[in-house]
Structure formats: structure tokens, C-alpha cells
């Protein structure tokens, strides 16, 4: 018990030292650390691929809208039949809400998502000639689309950099001491200031992967984390 108490005290002392050191970081130092984190993540996860199954930008947009508060695996179970029946915005816009609900019924929030899909498809047809727009301002006008979804589309369909702030990106960027903000838009702004645009999409996507595989919401696996030396929240070696 005494030894355990010593280890706990040492752990708290070490973590406190790290926190004090990184709280005194200048913007330049924090930016350097953020870029080092990006490099570590790129080595750990060299291949970037959206796990949502899609064949074109329209299908990616619909799949990302459906992925809110759902697993990618669940979305991938419903989209093949959805896209078989409605491969284009014109078809989806003409479908009944009841039919769309039935096709995506296994997903959370399926009723509200069905309404969003139908309205989004209508907007694509009437406002954008059936094409998915390629600007943030136009994308967030679409039903069911916020900045997170828009940045996924911009980054992966149009190669336009953007920070994708989901629950994993938010949690990890806070644990890494890269932001103290709670609002996703402010987190996006903080991270954007620390990294060059060419890193934005890959960095945030890899943070999401790392959050799913290592840096869990509860009991993060710090001892097998490639970022432990760069993270003020790490308990590795304690």
C-alpha cells in the first residue's frame, strides 16, 4: 500500500510538472508540438481512407449526414440499399419520408435524418443543379450539414483543407493541451492556427482514428500511445 501511494504521488508530481511546463508554452512552442504530434500520427496511421462506403461525392455527403451519433459500421449496413434505390439527388428528393425512414430505420435519430436527407436532396436539385457544392458557405446551407460534415466533404471530395471536429477530435485536442475551448468552431479555429492548411484534414482525421483505437474517453491506453511524450495528460510509465 505504501509503495502504491509513492507511485501515485510520483505520478501526480510528474503530471503536474508536465502540465505546468505546457501551460507556459508560447504559441510558437505549441505550434511546434502540434506539428510533431501530426508527424507522429502520420507515421502511426499512414493510410487515410473514409470508412463510410461511397462511390461519389453525393453518396459521401449522404453517408456523413447519416453518421451523426452512429457508428460507421451501422451506416454502411443501410447505405447500399438506400443508394441502390436512390443513386441520385433527384430520386432521393422525390422519395417519401416514410420510405427513407424504413431504409435507415436501424440508425439512431432515423426520423429526423430521413427528413434531412429528403430536404438536402431537394436543395441539391433546386439550388445546385444536382451537384454537391464545394464551398463551406454553400454546404452548411444544406439540411443536416454543419461545419464538421462540410469539412469532411471539402477535405475528402474536393481536397480543400479543413479541421474535422467530432467528439474524438475535441477530446484529444483538449487532452493534448492544444485547446481549452468547448465549442467546436473555436476548437477548429485553435487547431487551424497551430498547423499549416495542408495538415488540417489528415491531422483531424488521424486524431479521430487515434481516439477510437487508443485514446478512449474512459481509461485511455497511455502506455501504448505514440503521443505520450508530447501529451500533458499522459499517464504512461506511472
Predicted regions and their residues:
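Catalytic cores of DNA base-excision repair glycosylases
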Residues: 22, 27-238
Amino acid at each position: 500500500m505504501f509503495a502504491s501511494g509513492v507511485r501515485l504521488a510520483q505520478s501526480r508530481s510528474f503530471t503536474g510538472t508536465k502540465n505546468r511546463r505546457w501551460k507556459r508554452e508560447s504559441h510558437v512552442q505549441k505550434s511546434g508540438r502540434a506539428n510533431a504530434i501530426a508527424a507522429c500520427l502520420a507515421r502511426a496511421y499512414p493510410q487515410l481512407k473514409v470508412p463510410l462506403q461511397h462511390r461519389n461525392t453525393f453518396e459521401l455527403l449522404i453517408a456523413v449526414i447519416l453518421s451523426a451519433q452512429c457508428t460507421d459500421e451501422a451506416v454502411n449496413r443501410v447505405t447500399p440499399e438506400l443508394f441502390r434505390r436512390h443513386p441520385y439527388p433527384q430520386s432521393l428528393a422525390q422519395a417519401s419520408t416514410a420510405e427513407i425512414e424504413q431504409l435507415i430505420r436501424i440508425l439512431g435519430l432515423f426520423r429526423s435524418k430521413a427528413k434531412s436527407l429528403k430536404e438536402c436532396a431537394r436543395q441539391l436539385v433546386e439550388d445546385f443543379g444536382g451537384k454537391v457544392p464545394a464551398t463551406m458557405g454553400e454546404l452548411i446551407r444544406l439540411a443536416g450539414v454543419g461545419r464538421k460534415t462540410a469539412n469532411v466533404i471539402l477535405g475528402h471530395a474536393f481536397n480543400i483543407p479543413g479541421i474535422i471536429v467530432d467528439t474524438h477530435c475535441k477530446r484529444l485536442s483538449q487532452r493534448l493541451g492544444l485547446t481549452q475551448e468547448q465549442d467546436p468552431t473555436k476548437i477548429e479555429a485553435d487547431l487551424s492556427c497551430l498547423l499549416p492548411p495542408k495538415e488540417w484534414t489528415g491531422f483531424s482525421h488521424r486524431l479521430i482514428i487515434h481516439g477510437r483505437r487508443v485514446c478512449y474517453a474512459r481509461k485511455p491506453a497511455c502506455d501504448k500511445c505514440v503521443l505520450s511524450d508530447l501529451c500533458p495528460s499522459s499517464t504512461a510509465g506511472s
